[in-house]
């Protein structure tokens, strides 16, 4: 039941549960499968690296809903690495860090995400 509910939340066809993991999956289906694993395994810490990369707007919304469900139900910690702040808009963000060339050059709270949305990354890349 839990698997079925999570697959429904992620807009995944139930037949995917019978398939080999990621075999014949599109890029978006693989991303959803990653979030499905997150919801099923409930790790204390998850690192999501470019989870929104290559996803269309609808898929980003769906994946965000899955991540939000993890935040609400599992109470685990997330490290989300992204170049696009879109996926962060509907999530609870405790801290934000900007990394350039391997160094963290700015730390902030959720308001830093809003600042980046308004002015972009250009000011950080010039350092």
Q: Where do the language-model regions lie?
A:
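Walker B catalytic motif
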Residues: 50-51, 58
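ABC-family P-loop ATPase nucleotide-binding domains
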Residues: 1-42
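Conserved catalytic loops of ABC-family nucleotide-binding domains
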Residues: 66-80, 88-90
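Short alpha-helix of the ABC ATPase nucleotide-binding domain corresponding to the H-loop/switch region
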Residues: 57-64
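The feature captures the ABC ATPase H-loop/switch
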Residues: 83-87, 101
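Hydrophobic residue in the Walker B motif beta-strand
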Residues: 46-48
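Conserved catalytic segment of ABC-fold P-loop ATPases
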Residues: 89-98
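Conserved beta-strand-loop-alpha-helix hinge in the C-terminal portion
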Residues: 99, 103-126
